[in-house]
Each structure stands twice: as structure tokens, then as C-alpha cells.
């Protein structure tokens, strides 16, 4: 932590969102990070200190949320064609993931775990994500932690609508896993977040090489833009009672369907901090 404090810098994207004489803040995060990113930058720290609550996508400190997440990971898995399951097992073994984990839980979770294993090879870990840094700071100062969504809301957007869609998701994920360009795309995304490069993030769909199939495009739209109206509702509701520091994945911030645009349309004054 001492090393992180020595390298403390503002990373990501931060807006002040104001209405009714009250200021809240909207922070675009990256869900995985590096140990040296755990210390908050000065403007992030100062903005968080001005608020009365931290709002994450889900409140992982809530015991009911913890139970729901545990139940979700232990849910039934889908049956995949033999050759596809064999390919998934091979990728799983190559990433040194526990073989028994493939025997339970939604197939979509397995896809997410495979992507996270790729990120870890590039030094990015959920433990060091922006949410972790904000959560630790808020717990130390006894700042209330709230959730913008329920676990079920996230599951509804993450899980495939059918066995056929789940199979397509696995095939797309394995193709991405084999693609030698994938590490460069993740590095570009990471660099854009670190620098707060909103313009590059706005062009993500054009350069990520991750929206090449109908399944990928539909899943992305559902997972990102599709959740924004509900989170905007939650931020608006919380802001009516308390100044809130809302921390949400950075891709939820871009374009006309992004959270800054949605809140501006609801009468908030939006000011970029960094």
C-alpha cells in the first residue's frame, strides 16, 4: 500500500453532477487493476470526501447480495456440444483454472472467468480494481456503501437467452482467447482508462475487435447501454437524499446512451473534473 500511495494519481474519468443545490459525482472505473493503483488520486479523494455515500454497481458488502452471488455461481450449467466443451476445457487448463469449476455454474460465468484469466496474465486483477480502492477508503471512513443494481438485474443482462446463444458466446469467447491481437486491445482499453481518454473510449466499438458477431453485439448492447437507464434512475433517486459518489464501469459513460448524457437529459448539470 505504501508503494501505491507513492504513485497515487487520478485515473479514469470523473464528472460532477449537480441538481437542486447538491453535488454528486460520477466516476468511470476499470473493474481490474494493478496494485500500485490502489491509492486514490488527489481529485478522486477530494471528490469522494465531499459525498455522503459510495454507490457501486452492486453493493458487495450487503449480506443478501453475497448470498445471491454465491447462489448464482452454484447454479446449473448448460450442456455444450462435445467438441466445444473439449475446447473450453483445453483453454481452461491452459489458464491453470480449476477443472472442477467447469462442472457447475452458468456457462456465461465460465466465459467471464476465462477473460479475467487473460487480464491477469497482463497484470490486471479484480482485487486491485477501482471499486476495491473506493470501497476500502469508504469502509475506513465509515461512508455508507450502496448499490445501483440488484444481482438479478446483472444476471438478466449477463446470461444468455437460450442454449444456442450460450453456445455462440462460448465460441466467440474462445475465438477471442486465441486471437493474438486480444492483449493489445486490452492494453489500449487500459491505457485509455488510465489517461481518462474519453474520445478513445467512445470509439471502443470500432477498434476493440470484439463486436464481430450478432451475439457479441447483442450481448454488449444488453450489458452496457441496456443497463444505463436503470442506473441513472438509481443515481437520481439517491441524489435526492444525499450527495453520492457513483462508481460505474467506464464504458457506461460514453455516447448519447451513456450515464452523463442520460443525467444531463434529466436536468443535472454535468461538469467534467478529469
Could you say what each language-model-derived stretch is?
Residues 2-6, 11-219:
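Structured, acidic catalytic/metal-binding patches in enzyme active sites
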Residues 218-274:
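A cross-kingdom marker for long, charged
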Amino acid at each position: 500500500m505504501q508503494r501505491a500511495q507513492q504513485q497515487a494519481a487520478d485515473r479514469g474519468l470523473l464528472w460532477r453532477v449537480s441538481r437542486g443545490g447538491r453535488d454528486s459525482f460520477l466516476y468511470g472505473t476499470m473493474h481490474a487493476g494493478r496494485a500500485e493503483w490502489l491509492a486514490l488520486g488527489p481529485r478522486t479523494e477530494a471528490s469522494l470526501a465531499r459525498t455522503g455515500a459510495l454507490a457501486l454497481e452492486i453493493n458487495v458488502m450487503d449480506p443478501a447480495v453475497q448470498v445471491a452471488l454465491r447462489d448464482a455461481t452454484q447454479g446449473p450449467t448448460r450442456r455444450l456440444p462435445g467438441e466445444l466443451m473439449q475446447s473450453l476445457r483445453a483453454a481452461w487448463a491452459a489458464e491453470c483454472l480449476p477443472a472442477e469449476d467447469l462442472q457447475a455454474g452458468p456457462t456465461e460465468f465460465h466465459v467471464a472467468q476465462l477473460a479475467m484469466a487473460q487480464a491477469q496474465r497482463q497484470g490486471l486483477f479484480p482485487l486491485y480494481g477501482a471499486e476495491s480502492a473506493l470501497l476500502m477508503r469508504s469502509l475506513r471512513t465509515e461512508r455508507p456503501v450502496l448499490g445501483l443494481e440488484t444481482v438479478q438485474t446483472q444476471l438478466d443482462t449477463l446470461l444468455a437467452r437460450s442454449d444456442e446463444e450460450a453456445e455462440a458466446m462460448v465460441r466467440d469467447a474462445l475465438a477471442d482467447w486465441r486471437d493474438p491481437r486480444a492483449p493489445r486491445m486490452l492494453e489500449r482499453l487500459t491505457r485509455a482508462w488510465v489517461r481518462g481518454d474519453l474520445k478513445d473510449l467512445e470509439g471502443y466499438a470500432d477498434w476493440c475487435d470484439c463486436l464481430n458477431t450478432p451475439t457479441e453485439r447483442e450481448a454488449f448492447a444488453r450489458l452496457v447501454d441496456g443497463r444505463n437507464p436503470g442506473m441513472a434512475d438509481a443515481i437520481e433517486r439517491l441524489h435526492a437524499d444525499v450527495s453520492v459518489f457513483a462508481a460505474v464501469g467506464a464504458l457506461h459513460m460514453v455516447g448519447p446512451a451513456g450515464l452523463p448524457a442520460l443525467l444531463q437529459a434529466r436536468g443535472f448539470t454535468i461538469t467534467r473534473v478529469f
